[in-house]
Amino acid sequence: MDAPQTPQITQKISAKSLDWRRLNIRMAATQTPPPRSYIVGHLPERRGIYGMLIGPDGSRKSWLALHIAVAVASGRQVAGGLWPAPARGRVVFFTGEDVAQEMWHRIHAVAQNEDDASWLADCDENLDIIPLADGNDGLTLICPSDEKAGFAQHPNVAALIEYCKGARLIIIDPLADMVDASENDDVAARLLVQTLRSISRETGAGVLVSHHQNKAAMGSGDKSNQTARGSSKVPAGARWSVTLQPLSDKEAKDREIFDPEFWTKIHEGKASYSARTNSNDLALYHYPETTDAHGKTVGGVPLVRMLPVKEGGDDAPKPRTGRKRTSTNGAATRPNRGLGNVMGAGADEFDARFADMPLPNIPTTQEDGDDCPF
């Protein structure tokens, strides 16, 4: 991943049998360091690093993990513009919940929503998806042990490191399925943090894990990094984390969203090596499966989209999510879909491709009595 450590920036010190190195303070103070780089979003391109996707059940964590895998394998934007993946490279995606048949559906859905076929050649070469729930040998990172600590790295870790050497990114979804220990055990959590960092160091890859959110945060809407279920040591050890949450009833009402079940809010809960670029309006919108003019099925897939902002005042335009938006001259226009909703090359072509396709089956009459033209 990153270049070998510059010898001068650290100096070996004598600490009996421990391999410790002291930072060269003079060099650090007087010489400009190389610029930071990222694998995807703000996940640092550094050995010994892991990040987290945190969210409740059904918050599309696995979908986002797949989008990230495709983006890094092909050097593309995540989900049509969520974050960049500046350089392509090999991705190994271990999925513990979704069988091969389901992953087939999802990859096919992603393919139908891509305008540029070049991604397929890249992913065919760079993306390994391993559906562990489909009868493969499982993957366990830590397990009970007779040793004093009570836990040890599972032999699977050595096999994972051997297989993933040279990869750019390793995704583990979900983390809880790969740990044979209580999530609340701090001793097991400390070993898990060390194991994830070790996997990154030994393979040269960044590591990204998905993990469930705790019940208190699901009820309160807390989006912080520490809302991950179980011991706080695991999210504390991550250098980047993203929280996914469904819309609350109040948020949907305040924003005049009539199809909240299609939306997932995206929040950057932690970015240790960068300023966080959070927006309260950033989300994934899950477009349902539809059929094009030729009778071809276009799979449902979540893509990046901005949540509508309800503007104050009786004369202010009031966008109706998924159905109607208002242009600068007050004329009603069809909302952009997917890639064209936010940014990215090919946005116009994407919107043109879907211009005549049906929208989600949601209310077609506005609260003020105006008929929706769609």
Q: Where are the regions a protein language model picked out?
A:
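Conserved inter-motif catalytic segment of the P-loop NTP-binding fold
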Residues: 18-20, 86-183, 374
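Conserved ATPase "switch" residues in P-loop NTPase domains
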Residues: 73, 77, 164, 200-201
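A structural alpha-helix within SAM-dependent methyltransferase catalytic domains
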Residues: 66, 70, 161-165, 197
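Phosphate-binding/switch region of NTP-binding enzymes
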Residues: 52-53, 58, 62-63, 169, ...
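Hydrophobic alpha-helical membrane-association signature
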Residues: 68, 156, 188-192
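The Walker A/P-loop phosphate-binding site
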Residues: 7-112
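C-terminal regions of RecA-like/P-loop NTPase motor modules
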Residues: 4-6, 10-16, 164-166, 202, ...
